[in-house]
Amino acid sequence: MKVIAILISFFIFSSCYASDSTYTIKINFLYGSRPAKGYHQQESKRFGGIKGGHVNIEAGGRVLDFRPGNNPLLPNNKKPSGGFSINESIYWDSQTDKWTTVIVPVSQEQFMTLQNLIDSFAAKTPYDYAIFGMRCAAASYDVLSKIGLFKEYPNTKNVATHFYPKLLRKKVLKWAADNNYKIETHDGRTTRKWESDKGIL
């Protein structure tokens, strides 16, 4: 009887653990870019150029983006023109753009907290999008920190630390490698010059 009880306890624990570890979220990065030499007529400029790009968070078939409105230099949090939105998929071309996706296992509690944040932040953004303020990298870090994946920062420190996507991407890639999380990458088309992950900045 004792052996049977131990086996039952083991299977219950294994079942609960497996169930709790099946939740995953994606952190998606689009790399900054500009038209390659000789392709300025064919390719358009993009916001931010080489230091541009984008980052968003995907979970449960929904993508949370933080996008500009009137793109002010300084935020107007009382009347924000930009903010969070929910989309069905990433907006960039996954076949020809350069991107990286980090797949992160999370607990059921973290997953549900994220779903609630997606709903509440999309309904009412907690801050405005601004050139010298919260942008996609800092906003994404804020969301990830609120579900316990990273240390929470005050907005001022968050903005300074994650001023553009590459700064967050390098941190996330190192963190993912240290934790053996799955990383998917795709090289972009040669008609654009793409940002690399080399260098401090």
Predicted regions and their residues:
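Sec-dependent N-terminal signal peptides
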Residues: V3-S14
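Residue-level detector of intrinsically disordered/flexible regions characterized by low predicted structural confidence
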Residues: I4, N28, S81, V172-L173, ...
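Acidic/histidine-rich, surface-exposed loop or edge segments in extracytoplasmic proteins
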Residues: D93-T100, N116-K124
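Activation targets extended, charge/polar-rich intrinsically disordered C-terminal tails
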Residues: S19-Y23, K37-Y39, E43, D119-L201
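Solvent-exposed, acidic/flexible segments
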Residues: G49-G52, V104-S107, F111-L114, Y129-A137
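Glycine-rich catalytic cores of cysteine/serine-nucleophile enzymes that process amide/ester linkages
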Residues: D20-T101
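Generic structural signal for short, solvent-exposed loop/turn connectors between secondary structure elements
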Residues: M1-V3, Y17-S19, E58-L64, G148, ...
